[in-house]
Curated annotation (Swiss-Prot):
A GO molecular-function annotation: oxidoreductase activity, acting on the CH-OH group of donors, NAD or NADP as acceptor
Catalytic center residues: Y153 (proton acceptor)
Native source species: Mus musculus
Keywords for the protein's UniProt record, in alphabetical order: Membrane, NAD, Oxidoreductase, Transmembrane, Transmembrane helix
Listed transmembrane segments: 283-303, 367-387
Protein name: Short-chain dehydrogenase/reductase family 42E member 1
Similarity field: Belongs to the 3-beta-HSD family.
One Pfam family in the UniProt entry: 3Beta_HSD
Length: 394
């Protein structure tokens, strides 16, 4: 199904300065919507005609209200903004809580006060997944208990999603009408120009850190191309309307490309496309999990003095090494979502166009240095973190 047009509607996108928020804004703009991007940082790209940027902090209710004041009537809010998805951000619990929970509360309050009829929330697989194997799961699965989440980002996204879905059907503070809400739970996002995960991966490749893979080679995870994700959000917004029977009201939807794949095999075209050798060494998942735990503990101790980028966190080990994928049946049936096929070729070309790829003389000596560091870290994890009574539940 082609995503619908939005003639003369004004939409507001929180997190509109980020990769996905900006792409969603451009997609909506091309369909005739007037778009307001609300974020603490401005997009790196030039704003197309019909798109307006409002600078503000989602944690500040006054900033949120200012964003809404820039439009006579907002027809739909796409609440994309979040914090703490990966890397060292994942260890900043205070800011994660303030943005993901407090920011969501501010958005819901503004929607009810301003009479916004529709809200689409960008959630995550992680509200359900916390390290357990899930094969072809669906939306009937219960939320993972909050105390079982291995990271605060996933915990707060779960809290925020519940708040959004519980707000479905609430009456506006003034006048007639109610707020209708739904949640999109995406897989890992990729696409040319993605600025959160792919540059970090390429950095590891270029520095010689990608020297091994881990976990079961048969483990499967999922990804979603940015354009498929934008399409799903637009369809979800339409499915909150009366002419669609409000079918999406109060509902969550898993969204991916619909092609479960081994995490490391997914990135093989990127590694080899940039001229590097895909690693043949495979390490146990438990060993890498213990290493990630040590890295997190080290960051906890020295992070205030040296806020280094963790090589991996425990959640990232789970997300990359443990099978978890979900059915698209509900999204297809209720939203009309049909993912388009994509691969990593455009991503490879983007990185090449921006000066990446193997070719520097002396790189092998750098690889040897990082090999030594990695071996030392792995040996340290074995010698200092032996817990015979502890088992990793996957």
């Amino acid at each position: 199904m082609d995503s619908p047009r939005f003639p003369e509607e004004t939409v507001l996108i929180t997190g509109g300065g980020g990769y996905f928020g900006f792409r969603l804004g451009c997609a909506l703009n091309q369909k005739g919507a007037r778009v307001i991007l609300f974020d603490i940082t401005q997009p790196a790209q030039n704003l197309p005609e019909g798109i307006k940027f409002v600078c503000g902090d989602i944690r500040c209710l006054a900033d949120v209200e200012t964003a809404f004041q820039d439009a006579e009537k907002v027809a739909c809010v796409f609440h994309v903004a979040s914090y703490g998805m990966s890397g060292r951000e994942q260890l900043n619990k205070t800011q994660i809580e303030e943005v993901n929970v407090g920011g969501t509360e501010n958005i819901l309050r503004a929607c009810l006060e301003r009479g916004v009829p529709r809200l689409v929330y960008t959630s995550t697989f992680n509200v359900i997944f916390g390290g357990q194997v899930i094969r072809n799961g669906d939306e009937s699965l219960p939320y993972l208990p909050l105390h079982l989440h291995p990271d605060h980002y996933s915990r707060t996204k779960s809290i925020a999603e519940k708040k959004v879905l519980e707000a479905n059907g609430l009456a506006f503070k003034q006048g007639d009408g109610i707020l209708r809400t739904c949640a999109i739970r995406p897989a890992g996002i990729y696409g040319a120009g993605e600025q959160r995960h792919l540059p970090r991966i390429v950095s590891y490749i270029e520095r010689g850190l990608f020297r091994f893979v881990y976990g079961d080679p048969q483990s499967l995870v999922e990804f979603v191309h940015v354009d498929n994700l934008a399409k799903a959000h637009i369809l979800a917004s339409e499915a909150l309307k009366a002419d669609k029977g409000h079918v999406a009201s109060g509902q969550p939807y898993f969204i991916s490309d619909g092609r479960p794949v081994n995490n490391f095999e997914f990135f093989r075209p990127l590694v080899e496309g940039l001229g590097y050798t895909f690693p043949s060494t495979r390490l146990p998942l438990t060993l890498i999990y213990c290493l990630a735990f040590l890295v997190e503990m080290t960051h906890f101790i020295v992070g205030r003095l040296y806020n280094f980028q963790p090589f991996l966190t425990r959640t990232e080990v789970y997300k990359t090494g443990v099978t978890h994928y979900f059915s698209l049946e509900k999204a297809k049936k209720e939203l009309g979502f049909e993912p388009q096929p994509f691969d990593l070729q455009e991503v490879v070309e983007w990185f090449k166009a921006h000066g990446h790829g193997r070719g520097a003389a002396g790189q092998d000596s750098e690889f040897m240095l990082w090999d030594g560091i990695l071996i030392l870290l792995l040996a340290l994890s074995v010698l200092t973190w032996i817990l015979p009574s502890t088992t990793l539940s996957i």
